[in-house]
Design a protein with these regions (language model features):
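Bacterial N-terminal signal peptides that target proteins for export
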Residues: 1-9
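Bacterial N-terminal signal peptides
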Residues: 8-18
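Aromatic- and Gly/Pro-enriched helix-to-coil junctions and flexible linker segments
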Residues: 20-148, 153-157, 167-171, 175, ...
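Ankyrin-repeat boundary/"N-cap" motif
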Residues: 132-141, 165-172, 198-205, 229-237, ...
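Ankyrin repeat A-helix N-terminal signature
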Residues: 141-146, 175-181, 208-213, 239-246, ...
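Ankyrin repeat structural motif
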Residues: 147-155, 181-189, 212-221, 245-255, ...
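Ankyrin-repeat inter-repeat connecting loop/turn
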Residues: 161-162, 195, 226, 260, ...
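Preference for long, amphipathic alpha-helical scaffolds in soluble/luminal domains
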Residues: 192, 227, 290, 302, ...
Length: 746
């Protein structure tokens, strides 16, 4: 949160400066116009002592890096959370919480960001960290490659080298904790390794070891500080609780003085992490040692219900009031298949008319679900939900439901008093390509330009757009098509740099969404394994549930990501197949096998599920019979027009069609197969003259919209994804491609 200082004299001077700087044509001076506003309004909650949402605004380096997401995007106030939070409540409570800034002051921030967010070195409040020691870097590289002989030689020559400054200030010893066994860690400590030397993120070796009981024991026996906390507020206890099944480690840490209830951001609380992991045993341990559910935050309640862990819910359900259950109800309605959890929240007094920061009600979420949860919609209506409520974009439950076609939910809403709405389709100019070659060649430049534009404007890699473009470029190259290699290299570099900024957070169990997608995309572009990919792989392994699957929690009901456990499991497994750290293959092989086994029995509810079940089983290469059955089920949903739809009540789309075709081909379906050829005809007939395919978004907005130069306005992001899948499917069928063939049982 952004908090206001009361400094009337200074404020008067700043208002004068703000008025001048608010003029659109005026050049904003950071020191004169922006810095005083930051100091007065922001530092209490985002300064040296407190960093709410892991965001610190008093230093240039941390401000530009952002917190849990990019906050300042130079050149684009429209995609900068700082400006959006200051200017209104579209994406959270308007800041500062004590009262909005004046329009002139808000304009200062807007103009400063749009002019490039210049922040002079003299005012950066940063002390550039010393460069990594060359010897330390060589030691780290030896560790990650499994070259124990070279590493041990360095240690034998100079034991003090264990504490040298390596990448991001992390010592070779810290990396030894990641890449070596417990016996080696013990030996290195005996040689003088410092267990408490922090890196640039204030993380210590104990935080990196927190998922390994033997290493944790050894470090504490050698004096590691059990309650040390990183800049993000995470302790070893919070990191340990992130992984399901961590009770032995959590118990050991608690017995050795770990604080179960430290003050700080609620998402760093160990109890919150345990609830998100669905681990009742760990939650019980924490509560027995003094953790307080309220201190862990209301999201802890939502997390426990979302994981469908009944014991987890029982442990904390009496700690929260109706207000907390109202928030949980909104969160749960995103995953509207949680009927029992939604009923539980209502039974505890949740307000069915509750809204989130974007004006979205539980009914808006439920009506928007691809799973068509009629019982949930009826439950909410029966308890008084407003069938004509609108989110901040003016969308009603009926509008969102009709995006999924004429369904029983549409009928129920109309019977319950929803005002009729007509969804107008845009005027589209189709231009059927005469050949696959011409269709693919029209699409490639548009995809590349939009891809790099998204990365530059958003400051993040998106949840799947970047990866899909990477996969598309790899596919079309193999088929003999030309791409802009300079632009492609720039995009891959940007993605890698983004994850480098997140590397230490990944070690601590914190990550942005879609990391598995990103690794699959990087591999498609032949990105070599390094410390960054190791960190992402470690995070992915940490988040696997004991039954082998990966869940997906997110803040909006957007297909195909939210609640899509099959797709996230398949992609996570694939990412680990590509980038499992070389020193831990046995551990990761088990993780991959568990994922493949889970996919065999996973029930597919949508074509997104069916598609990724085919992908996953093909990648697992473990159960041919299950793969054949999954292919048969996906083929059975092809429409008469040759396309596939997201769900049966919707029309065919290039997204669902291209995705299904690529998956089937990956599983062995030849492009000469009649079903594949029908898909080709559908895609060729639905491409637009600008080279794109149009897909109408059927989910509520999550990110602030901005134009990346792709057609179709506010539908452009999903249209770009659909264009990627369509382009891949066509490129695979081009004359230059030599497909694998397989017999498919129908």
């Amino acid at each position: 949160m952004l908090t206001r200082y009361s400094a009337s004299v200074v404020l008067g001077a700043c208002l004068f400066a703000a008025t001048a700087a608010a003029e659109t044509d005026s050049k904003v001076d950071f020191g004169r116009d922006v810095l005083p506003l930051i100091r007065q309004n922001c530092i209490t909650c985002h300064g040296p002592k407190v960093q709410m949402n892991n965001f610190r605004l008093d230093r240039r380096s941390t401000a530009m890096r952002g917190g849990t997401r990019s906050v300042i995007v130079p050149g684009s106030s429209a995609s900068s959370r700082l400006y959006l939070r200051l200017s209104g409540n579209q994406f959270g409570k308007q800041m500062p919480p004590t009262g909005a800034l004046s329009p002139e002051q808000v304009a200062v921030f807007k103009n400063w960001i749009d002019q490039g967010a210049e922040w002079p070195d003299a005012l950066a409040n940063d002390v550039d960290p010393p460069p990594a020691d060359a010897k330390a870097v060589r030691m780290v590289m030896a560790l990650r490659s499994g070259d124990a002989a070279t590493f041990n030689k360095f240690v034998a020559e100079d034991p003090k080298s264990l504490n040298l400054r390596g990448p991001n200030g992390s010592t070779p010893f810290m990396f030894a904790v990641l890449y070596s066994d417990a016996a080696t860690v013990s030996q290195l400590l005996d040689k003088g390794a410092d267990p408490n030397q922090p890196n640039d993120s204030n993380a210590t070796a104990l935080m990196w070891a927190a998922n390994d009981l033997d290493k944790t024991r050894i470090l504490l026996a050698h004096g590691a500080q059990v309650n040390a906390r990183s800049n993000d507020g995470r302790s070893a206890l919070a990191v340990a609780a992130t992984k399901a099944g961590a009770a032995p480690i959590v118990k050991f840490l608690l017995e050795h003085g770990a604080n179960p209830d430290p003050a700080g951001p609620t998402d760093t609380a160990a109890l919150h992490q345990a609830a998100a992991a669905g681990d009742a045993e760990v939650m019980q341990l924490l509560l027995d040692h003094g953790a307080h559910a309220k201190a862990a935050g209301e999201d802890t309640l939502s997390a426990a219900i979302e994981t469908d862990c009944k014991k987890c819910i029982q442990l904390i359900e009496k700690s929260f009031d109706a207000k907390a259950y109202s928030k949980a109800l909104v969160d749960l309605s995103i995953h509207s298949e949680h009927y029992d959890g939604i009923k539980l929240a209502i039974d505890h007094g949740a307000d069915v008319k509750a809204v989130d920061v974007e004006g979205r009600t539980p009914l808006l979420f439920a009506a928007n679900s691809d799973l068509l949860p009629l019982n949930t919609v009826k439950l909410l209506i029966d308890h008084g939900a407003d069938v004509n409520a609108k989110n901040m974009y003016g969308n009603t439950p009926l509008y969102l439901a009709k995006l999924h076609g004429n369904t029983p939910i549409v009928d129920l809403l109309l019977k319950s008093g929803a005002k009729p709405e007509v969804i107008a389709d845009p005027a589209l100019k189709f231009q059927k390509a005469n050949t696959i070659q011409s269709a693919v060649e029209r699409a490639i430049p548009r995809l590349q330009r939009a891809d790099i534009s998204f990365l530059q404007q958003s400051g993040c890699v998106s949840c799947h757009n970047e990866a899909l473009t990477d996969m598309t470029l790899s596919t079309v190259r193999k088929a003999g098509f030309k791409v802009d290699e300079q632009m492609a290299a720039k995009e891959v570099s940007g993605v890698a740099q983004f994850f480098e900024l997140w590397r230490d957070r990944l070690y601590q169990g914190n990550a942005p969404g879609g990391v598995a997608y990103s690794l699959v995309g990087l591999h498609a572009e032949h990105y070599p394994a390094d410390l960054v990919t190791d960190a992402v792989a470690r995070y992915i392994e940490m988040k696997q549930f004991p039954d082998g699957h990966w869940g997906y929690g997110c803040g909006g009901s957007r297909a195909p990501l939210c609640g899509a456990e099959i797709s996230n499991t398949a992609l996570s497994m694939r990412a680990l197949q590509f980038y499992a750290p070389v020193t831990s293959h046995a551990k990761y092989d088990k993780t991959i096998q568990m994922a493949g086994a889970w996919l065999v029995g996973a029930p597919a509810k949508t074509n997104e599920d069916r598609t990724y079940k085919v992908f996953g089983l093909a990648w697992a290469k473990a159960d041919k019979r299950a793969l054949q059955q999954a292919m048969k089920e996906l083929l059975a949903t092809q429409r008469a027009d040759g396309g596939w739809s997201d769900i049966a009540s919707m029309n065919s789309t290039a997204y669902a069609t291209g995705e299904a075709m690529v998956a089937l081909h990956e599983a062995g379906l030849p492009v000469t197969d009649a079903a594949y050829q029908r898909g080709v005809k559908y895609l060729l007939s639905t491409q637009l003259e600008d080279g794109s395919w149009y897909i109408k978004t059927h989910s509520q907005a999550v990110q602030p919209y901005f134009d990346v130069g792709f057609p179709h306005g506010e539908d452009q992001w999903i249209s770009a994804c659909g264009t990627s899948w369509a382009t891949m499917a066509l490129a695979l069928a081009s004359p230059e491609t030599h497909p694998v063939t397989a017999q498919v049982v129908r």
